[in-house]
């Protein structure tokens, strides 16, 4: 890729500063379906092992990264009036986690577990 092009790859903070709506997802089936690795990378700009640092000036806050996975992804699907937020009248698609990822360290976010998944207001997964 080269250093010049690498400097503009995944320039999340620069995009937000220009008013761009970020939409995050996973690259499943190439990568694990979990968003926790993406959250970690967005807020630390490091690989999962913490050894590589990719342009730290592009770090996001956890709230910004979560918004990219929720409201941003709904916007990218042209469904921001139907999903992406937990408000009356919108689809209730959400997960219940074993920790508050907005208060946890990025390393603890990597270890988060899904306790329940709700799609359209109905539980479709519950941890044993």
Positions of PLM-derived features:
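His/Asp/Glu-enriched, well-ordered alpha-helical/loop segment
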Residues: 1-107, 112-120
């Amino acid at each position: 890729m080269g250093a010049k092009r690498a400097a503009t790859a995944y320039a999340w903070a620069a995009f937000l500063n220009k008013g761009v709506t970020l939409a995050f997802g996973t690259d499943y089936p190439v990568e694990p379906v979990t968003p926790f690795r993406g959250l970690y990378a967005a807020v630390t700009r490091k690989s999962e092992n913490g050894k590589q640092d990719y342009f730290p000036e592009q770090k996001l806050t956890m709230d910004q990264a979560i918004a990219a996975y929720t409201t941003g992804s709904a916007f990218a699907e042209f469904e921001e009036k139907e999903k992406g937020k937990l408000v009356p009248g919108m689809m209730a698609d959400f997960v219940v986690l074993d920790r508050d990822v907005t208060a946890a360290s990025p390393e603890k976010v990597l270890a988060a577990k899904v306790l329940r998944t709700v799609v359209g207001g109905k539980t479709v997964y519950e941890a044993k």
